[in-house]
């Protein structure tokens, strides 16, 4: 049974295929006819094509039919063997080691693609580490993720954990998506309609049914279609029923600036998908006005590719309620968001900060991605810099207090200037003005701060690890970090 494989590399495709077929047939049905091993392989192609199954009496035609039937049984990937004659009489594929044959290449390539499917790779993303944080005086779990996993599920579940609607055992360190979906399903089923009328109850039951249907999608991703008219404006889909039933607000900050009338006219009340279709139609139109409108709409999408505008950030800050927990959608990512003392923060769920107890929230105060890390009480976090920089432990409390005071002064300036600036300035100009004022405030206190530490202390800011997001320049951010 070992010898036929040694003879597979034949000079032609037809002889190679028929050699393997005939020798397999001889090995199982009539070994007494060919006591010689190698010589019999050369004589086999002309003797046995007629008596394989009775259906392939014309050689190549019968071999082609049987070749089509051999692909389904070959599904074991790297441990393939030649199939028995009753299952197939075609070339065995990878086990024969013929890289130049067309049939062999096709038979080998298909099983090798099977391990690449998302279903097989999904278990790698099925387990998530639990991070325990002090939240309003109680030890509370939040779920972290190591890669782009099911962020809608994690964003919603972290809200339920922070609201203490779902609790975990105190020693829980790892959780699966199935467990999270079970907890979420129990929360949905435990919701009772507030209205007792029959019509509203039927509508409520329909919403619950829709939510339970789309529940598995939370583990892979949701299809949401934003509208550029408001931070709460989304095209309604069954996926939105999950947020409605749980009472979790869903926000975005991708808004068109009302002080750009051309962009407002071009975008209108369309959703993202509708706007993309409009751009395609307008660009191929013979009407010059439509072409211009399409170009303006396309420019809006290109200049706001970050999916967060200054106008959207202002509206988001004004719309979100104090201490409200919500889900923020941006760049196809869902984050847990809250508002504390008139400022927005996103929950840090990166597994890289699993052991960083002082890194819980990340500020959201500009569109460029520059941010500050805070602990669970929204105090600026310096734990990352202490372990790597030149900051001494003796002055840490004083430095923390001084930085917090400077930050509060900057926030106070922003709140004082915002009503006046919004009367005649666009959102971008207002943001630049606020940043300039805060920069001047920082320069006023910086000489006092730089004289305190000795020369090695200059390494405090440069000693932050690469994983921490830092300010690109002091004039681009309204958050003061020293």
UniProtKB/Swiss-Prot annotation:
> Which residues does this entry assign to the site Ubiquitin-binding?
427, 430-431, 434
Q: Which UniProt keywords are given for this protein, alphabetically ordered?
A: Hydrolase, Phosphoprotein, Protease, Thiol protease, Ubl conjugation pathway
Biased-composition ranges, Polar residues, are 106-119
* Regions of compositional bias (Pro residues) in chain numbering: 82-94
Instruction: Quote the catalytic residue positions.
Output: 151, 333
Q: Could you tell me which residues belong to the region Ubiquitin-binding domain (UBD)?
A: 402-441
Report biased composition (Low complexity) as residue ranges.
437-446
State the protein's name.
Answer: Ubiquitin carboxyl-terminal hydrolase MINDY-1
Tell me the segments the record calls region Disordered.
Answer: 1-119, 437-482
Q: Which organism is it from?
A: Rattus norvegicus (Rat)
Q: InterPro entries from the xrefs?
A: MINDY, MINDY_domain
